[in-house]
Amino acid sequence: MSSDVPLLNDYKQDFLLKRFPQTVLGGPRLKLGYCAPPYIYVNQIVLFLMPWALGGTGTLLYQLDILRDYTAAALSGGLMVFTAAVIQLISVYARSKPVVVRRMRTRDILAEEDQHEFTSCAGAETVKFLIPGKKYVANTVFHSVLAGLVCGLGTWYLLPNRVTLLYGSPGATAVLFVFGWITLCIGEYSLIVNTATETATFQTQDTYEITPLMRPLYIFFFVSVDLAHRFIVNIPALEQMNQILHILFVLLPFLWALGTLPPPDALLFWAVEQVLEFGLGGSSMSTHLRLLVMFIVSAGAAVVSYFIPSTVGVVLFMTGLGFLLSLNPSDVSMVFRYGVTRHRVGSSHEARPGNSGHWFPWKECFLFIAVLGMALLEAGLLHHYVSVPQVSRSGAQAVVGYVLMVLLSIVWILRETQSIYIFGIFRNPFYPKDIHAVSVFYDKQNKLLKIGAVRWILLTLVSPLAMVAFLALDSSLHGLHSVSVSIGFTRAFRMVWQNTETALLETVVVSAVHMVSSTDCWWNRSLDTGIRLLLIGIMRDRLIQFITKLQFAVTVLLALWTEKKQHRKTTTTLCVLNTVFAPFVLGIIVLSTLLSSPLLPLFTLPVFLVGFPRPVQSWPGAVGTAACVCTDSVFYHQMVPRLTAALQTAMAAGSLGLLLPGSHYLGRFEDRLIWIMILECGYTYCCINVKGLELQETSCHTAEAQRVDEVFESAFQREHPQVCSLNEHLENVLTPCTVLPVKLYSDARNVLTGIIDSPDNLKEFKDDLIKVLVWVLIQHCSKRPSTQENKTENTGEASPALPPAANSSPCPESLEDSESANSDWSDGSIFDDEPAIKNRKEKLQSKDLPCTKLPIPGSVDSQNPDDHSAGTGPKNDLYRTVILGLPAVDKGQREDVAYIPLVEFSCSQSRLLSLPEEWRSNSTPRSKILEMSALFPEDWYQFVLRQLECFHSEEKSRVLEEIAKDKALKDLYVHTVMACYIGLFGIDNGVPSPGQLVRVYNGGLPWAGTLDWLSEKPELFHLVRKAFRYTLKLMVDKASLGPIEDFKELTNCLREYERDWYIGLVSEEQWKRAILEEKPCLFCLGYESSMGVYTSRVLMLQEMSVHIGKLNAEAVRGQWANLSWELLYATNDDEERYSIQAHPLLLRNLTVQAADPPLGYPIFSSKPLPIHLC
């Protein structure tokens, strides 16, 4: 990115000057960008000031002592309801009146959609422009009533006498009154006239018109505090809050314009998430529905615990329910469904194999039951027999506190040994040195994982039970019930299981503070242990957020100064301003930390704003429902099960660090990038979302991908790393964690220059093609069920005599043609031909059931059920010559047309390998087939027959020998193989060109008289294309690995293709299916038109090393929050979004890709994936 690229080019500047004032004022469009009549602006000003006029009427009557304060508020509200209703009715009438709006001619294409021609001050087109109206009638009524409430309560809120009582200053009253009513007018205008485009946008589409409610919602909040202060007197804190909020009230327009205040839907989910996590001890959830359900259940648990009379009962209830609520809700529902099913089925469940326990998580279930039983027994006994009502520093609880300190130290040390860097700074001396020696590397890593197993035992079994003992011994549980005890201890007993590692840290901090502080201090005297843990939990979370936000801000500032490509003309100015106003910048960081909202760097420059608070997911839609799917998405789809299995081991051992909802990880292998986000965490499980980023690397993508490779290489691939050396890329948002062995597809692309265009290879290709055709057809016929054998059993009727072939009348539509309409023209039969053939044979058998005329034993049946149904009998069908599809010919040419008379095999078993009758009829001249038959490899043909495994009798070798000597069968294969060969290359037996090979490989046939004959037989066509692709792959292998020595080696090679390879095209559905079924190898041929070369692509399924690194979560949230701003106001010299430009330190391009569509464009996004850490 060059330094002179403007953040806002000309048309974006004009757009900003139109859009931003509209956002600030709540909707009035005072700058249109084209000439409009003055009444357009006058009307908007009148509508904007209408609430002030109505509220001013009530205020004036109150100041003149004509009305009481609440009466004046009611009068203003009533007038506003009437006015809003009239405005909405006018809008409905204008929209129902047909009007032709003519566009104004202009050269500014970008602004055309906003330009209209107005005819009168109160015309329909003017009204529709000023007041767009509501989509729903209910909203029309609701918003009108709501506007009246806002106006009435706002009048009451800003009464001069009331404001003077708060501040005692007429000057302050005047200022707050004027600017306060501007705030009210902004809120009213967006509600009843025209809604502004909000910078704080959460949903991509406002389907239910929630956006107009955003500004009135915050007005109601400010008014509610004032009402509470009015009716609840003698509370100094409430009075001070009311004074502060009155000042903030006049600043609301700027907070709305800057996008600091969240929209209602984001505010709801954020508030529920915060209360669930910090007030009730839960975790953010993977879906909004699970979040709401878990919040209701958790809140209900806290309420129920308040009404339990027995202290032992309270302890047991909190322990048991805290454990159950920390489990994966999906697992709990599975156990419930299993129990209901067992109850319904009863003793008859043995008759249903589908209900067997192979799918049920018995191991986890037994573990949970055992741990829950131990926890309940421990908590009940300790609380009843050991716990004392007095606080003591030398009691049993203090001893347990020391034990928890030791456990925390051990668990943290063991966790840090699993990652490449200790605290992300110093290289771990115990981690394997070099990944180049793969086997040695993984052997050493497995030893570390054994240490991780010790950590898992301490963290999953020992620590929760120790913390339950610490809480059960607390003296606060012996006192009378209070709200603080119910909330605090409900959360504490839940956190023990929900997030054991953070709960362990919080408990140790509380225990340590209690030991070192005085018993008379406010912390120990006024707060019980549950509330202390709650406050420590909030401080812990906010401290982590503050540190990561500060790291993010420093990285943005350093990148602007150190990265040459990020230099701009304003670089020095921005750096100086950030240094001078460092306290102000620090205050912004603190504010965003307190609100748990993203720190938004405008255009990823050190111009920081506070983004609006939002849930951890950052996006409103369901996880995994949106992605820009392409042909490469299937690689990530195949990868997900393997990756989750590898992540399960790494997460359980602690290789990925502290697992918290909202954490982001980046995986890298070959040219693929994986984005992993933790959605929720619980006892022995976490839920993740995996996104796959594009493989088609752009220049910006490549620049950041190279930096990612550098970060991982410096960590894992240094030949002689120093002990405890520093992380060389400490300033980067990516910190390497570990390497995972995952079975994935490696992708190799090669240029076939010198192979596919070699004359010698092309000549050998033609000879090999005939051999492969023979092998494919014999293998196909040997594996399919034999219908002829079924048809010839128990026959006692004599067959009709053979009529001369020359007198055969033209036959009706053949059986293959009748089936072609229902046949599946797909690539599924290339490697999976048996099921397709079986289905076709079943259709043939079902159609042949009514037939009573059976063929001569040893002959080829050619009955047509259509003829039978017509009553014509099979007399002429047995010996007909199929010549359909041929062009008209004269008698001289007629004699050269190939026909197949009745075939009589010398071996009775030959019929098992006979080709279908419809394949043997073709339009190829018989003389040409006879001429080309010399190319048929008879020795190879006999060798393939002798290698068949379809006969299992004791006389297998004798039967195969007889079949190999059957001349009729051989002639049948010669005729069909050579006809297919001619169908591929035409009548002229020339050397094919590379372009011709690629065309046939892709499924195209050269134009010839045999084209229709071959293409009209889908099954045969697919087999021929399969043989052609095998032959081309064989040519590439011979050029790379050397020539084939003998027939046995060739057979083994073809069997390997059949068993382990899929050879086809990337665009075929079978290619995707082969990847999902994990075919060991895949091959594809292509042509690179830009370079003019032929290429091959080979995929090999093998265990690969996937590098995993942890991203700065706040850097991700901040850049995602910045996207809406850039979509509105940013651009660059390529007319692209500014944010997709490469930023090697922030990984800006990759971060934008990982955002949910339409802002981002990942090519794959998984559903929430549960990972069981046990």
Swiss-Prot record:
Pfam families (alphabetical): Pecanex_C (PF05041)
Top-rank taxon, per record: Eukaryota
Residues linked to a glycan: N790, N1122, N1149
Subcellular location: Membrane
Protein keywords: Glycoprotein, Membrane, Transmembrane, Transmembrane helix
Keyword Membrane belongs to the record: yes
Membrane topology: Multi-pass membrane protein
Record's compositionally biased regions (Basic and acidic residues): 835-846
PANTHER family: PECANEX (PTHR12372), PECANEX-LIKE PROTEIN 4 (PTHR12372:SF6)
Name of the protein: Pecanex-like protein 4
Organism: Mus musculus
